[in-house]
Amino acid sequence: MALFATLACLTTGAIPAEAGTGGASATESDGTATGGQGFVFSSPMRPAGATWYGPGLYGNHTACGQTLRPNTIGVAHRTLPCGTTLKIAYHGHSLVTQVIDRGPYTAGNDFDLTNGARQALDFEGVGTVHYAVAVGRRNGSG
């Protein structure tokens, strides 16, 4: 199944994972999970090392063409295509966002969170997040 990619990366494009689902995610018969605006996510959530970035880079363009600002919500990943929609979870907080940049460039980490994503997740700076990749939308969502 192809990765679901959004048509545009929005600087404040995060969608609370609970939006429209009452905080619940369901598991479909094919093993995928649903949640956050009708997206269907790969399941189960997978752990990944993460850091955050931003200070000193604000005003610069990301690899995906956005201008990075303190409130920009998104993630950097080395190989996932720009615009790939992800659900990211950390210690009871979660959000749905997109890949907007390339990185991280520190060994052992899979994601760099923007400051806006870090704040939305109450992320402490370095740690393990859990993620799932959007693989489509439920019928009738959009």
Model-derived segments and their meaning:
Residues 1-142:
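Secreted/periplasmic proteins
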